[in-house]
Swiss-Prot record:
Site feature: Important for dimerization: H175
Similarity comment: Belongs to the aerobic coproporphyrinogen-III oxidase family.
Pathway named in the protein's UniProt entry: Porphyrin-containing compound metabolism; protoporphyrin-IX biosynthesis; protoporphyrinogen-IX from coproporphyrinogen-III (O2 route): step 1/1
UniProt KW keywords: Cytoplasm, Heme biosynthesis, Manganese, Metal-binding, Oxidoreductase, Porphyrin biosynthesis
Keyword Iron set for record: no
Organism: Escherichia coli O157:H7
Enzyme class: oxidoreductase
Main subcellular location: cytoplasm
Subcellular location: Cytoplasm
Protein name: Oxygen-dependent coproporphyrinogen-III oxidase
Necessary cofactors: Mn(2+)
Region (Important for dimerization): 240-275
Length: 299
């Protein structure tokens, strides 16, 4: 089947609505919407929930941009895109909870298509979701990865292991020699065997995110915590900022190509701290995190 960008766009708009409704149902606070237009073509809907009952900040962003030609930075690596008009669309979200026992989570699903008359379109899907705990709970990690594995199974037994490894490899801070969190799924350049199959997988990932995340939120959101746990959460959030500004391809591409800065940086935690040469006490729950986030098979 020929790629249907309109069908993908409708799914993404509905996905943004659904995820916002689900997060509001858990939190009680409402999202504030900021609609924007891109000068070169397209626009989006950025939605942010701030200082809610559960979430310190949750951002759920939809964007759909298009243009007559790709930027040179993109065609340098993919010469087949030169001279083509393009459309890029996606939903991207990050949730930063108040409670340090509730992990931060991130998800993204996206579609890209470039066309020119008389030629087959070039298209692909990408996306995934990943979890960044501050305090490790095995049952949470197992639930997260089991949900990821189960949504992948209808698409082949090798899908989950492949995209889990890709996620582990991608969300890695080389300058710290550590993982950002416990991973999940990451895929890109997906265009085989056909559009329908790839679109169905992208939909499964988009819908699977809240199935994976919200039960963990419900389990941890009422746990008591104090200043020590909060300080550790803010310190570990520093790793999130470091990854996004130093290594994340999407953030760098968006900033380098004149994307909407407010929406791109919506993933940033509202409060964060750094501490020179911080070392958690041996045997403490904080010290245990470095071992917990090491790559392993959770299911």
């Amino acid at each position: 089947m020929k790629p249907d960008a309109h069908q993908v766009k409708q799914f993404l708009l509905n996905l943004q609505d659904t995820i916002c409704q689900q997060l509001t149902a858990v939190d009680g606070a409402e999202f504030v919407e900021d609609s924007w237009q891109r000068e070169g073509g397209g626009g989006g809907r950025s939605r942010v929930l701030r200082n809610g009952g559960v979430f310190e900040q949750a951002g759920v962003n939809f964007s759909h941009v298009h243009g007559e030609a790709m930027p040179a930075s993109a065609t340098a690596h993919r010469p087949e895109l030169a001279g083509r008009s393009f459309e890029a669309m996606g939903v991207s979200l990050v949730v930063h909870p108040h409670n340090p026992y509730v992990p931060t989570s991130h998800a993204n699903v996206r579609f890209f298509i470039a066309e020119k008359p008389g030629a087959e379109p070039v298209w692909w899907f990408g996306g995934g979701f990943d979890l960044t705990p501050f305090y490790g709970f095995e049952e949470d990690a197992i639930h997260w990865h089991r949900t990821a594995r189960d949504l992948c199974l209808p698409f082949g037994k090798d899908v989950y292991p492949r995209y889990k490894k890709w996620c582990d490899d991608y969300f890695y801070l080389k300058h710290r020699n550590e993982q950002r969190g416990i991973g999940g799924l990451f895929f890109d350049d997906l265009n085989t065997p056909d559009f329908d199959h790839c679109f169905a997988f992208m939909q499964a990932v988009g819908k699977g995110y809240t199935d994976a995340y919200l039960p963990i939120v419900e389990r941890r959101k009422a746990m008591a915590y104090g200043e020590r746990e909060r300080n550790f959460q803010l310190y570990r959030r520093g790793r999130y900022v470091e990854f996004n500004l130093v290594w994340d391809r999407g953030t760098l591409f968006g900033l380098q190509t004149g994307g909407r800065t407010e929406s791109i940086l919506m993933s940033m935690p509202p409060l964060v701290r750094w501490e020179y040469d911080y070392q958690p006490k041996d045997g403490s729950p904080e010290a245990a995190l470095s071992e917990f986030i090491k790559v392993r098979d959770w299911v």
